[in-house]
Amino acid sequence: MSLDSEDLKVTFFPPLYHQRRIWLLETLRRERITEIIDIGCGEGSLLATLCQPAPWLGPGSSQDDDHYLSSLFDNIGCSDEDTPNLHPKRIAGVDISSCDLNVATECTSPASANPLYMRWEPLEVELWKGSIDVINPALINVECVVATELIEHLTEDILIHVAPIVLGVYRPRLFLITTPSYTFNARWSPPGTRKPGGHPDPTGRTDRVFRHPDHKFEWTVEEFAQWCMTIAHQWGYVVDIGGVGTAQQKDPWGRDKILGGATQVASFKRMDDRVSTGKRERGSLAVHSATNTKGPHELVKRYYYEAHPRAGNPSDLREIGEAMVEKFEQWGETILRIEELWFADDVPILCGGSIEVMINAAERHQRLDLQRIPGRRRGDWKIELVGGVQRRLMDWSPVQLKSEAEIVTMEDDEPEYGMERSSFDSGVHIGNHDDNTWCSEDTNWSQVGGWADEAHLDWGRQ
């Protein structure tokens, strides 16, 4: 079989770096993580994403002590508790590059926040300069550490310290890591051949050709799995290994299942039994003595995002209900989605940032009928105005209606920070490992601006 290079083009949809980010954010949301440390944060694209506020308070955040709220979603098949928004309280980034950290300082600044998004929860942001093979006491016992597209850039003398420091000293509940799959590289050429181009192993240890000139290694599926299982056993963790990034095109030789995903991912969860805890305690003593030759990390910047002054302090339920009725009358609508009402002017402020309070108010108001939709998230539930519209405001106009009914979504329209495209790569970026995209609960790829562009992976294209 003879195929030219055009036939072997490989594309991903969504782009590979988006798929990595989606896996990461979905895992953080599923585990309800509130503290995230990004080692090798680069220019801070992940941190900038995490700085975006959730649209409402997390479950149990409201100061309303009505027991009705706590039981409101019992026995509901699908709600935001099943696929929650992220509610980070503290995020931090670590990197060795002053230049990259300068960019991260700008994109995580409260001054860069979108004023359209109300913030209902405070957030602390830290940026540290230092090598990842140096222990930072401020990161010990963090909840989650992430390392996306990082380890392949590390020399062997630094790589050997990653697991001992992260798993043995920092001891996060969750450690998430991604790295390119060398196994998948075969997808760019016919079996038994290798295209010219690419980047030869700079260490000379192998005859492999890598996706990026700065990569010190690229592991096969078996090599990555072996490394993950070894360090998980050594430090008392259980690991789940997988992959993301399947080519849109079918492989002419039927290798798709064998080659797997373009990016390898692993999720390490800490085990807290006596044996596992003992492993970490004993091992961390040796780690401290072996990594004290370099200077300590330097705190480059610390930001505090303040919550809205009304957060957790809702108004009277009747006042909230009347405000919602007013919106129905003003817009001339009889049925609205919960999200449509939530993003309407002062409604979230009256609710103190709690969507549970808003739903409670709708349940109790005689002119509002809450319509739960089985299998749908709360934002898609509907509220009907009982009796229909009885009046309209005198100053109503179609232009005003469109403006006031506009829904603010969590889809990010911020530009990517310093994103560069390298040959034979769909998103490996030194110092800026991924895009800046918030992962919402329901993502319609056909409607996300810019995501429909194919991410072409041409080995020789710059």
Residue ranges of model-derived segments:
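Class I SAM-dependent methyltransferase Rossmann-like catalytic core
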Residues: 2-30
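Conserved SAM-binding loop of SAM-dependent methyltransferases across substrates and taxa
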Residues: 43-86
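S-adenosyl-L-methionine-dependent methyltransferase catalytic module, highlighting the catalytic core
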Residues: 71-77, 83-86, 103-142, 155-358, ...
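Hydrophobic adenine-recognition pocket in adenosine-nucleotide-binding enzymes
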Residues: 150-153
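Conserved SAM-binding motif I beta-strand of class I
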Residues: 90-95
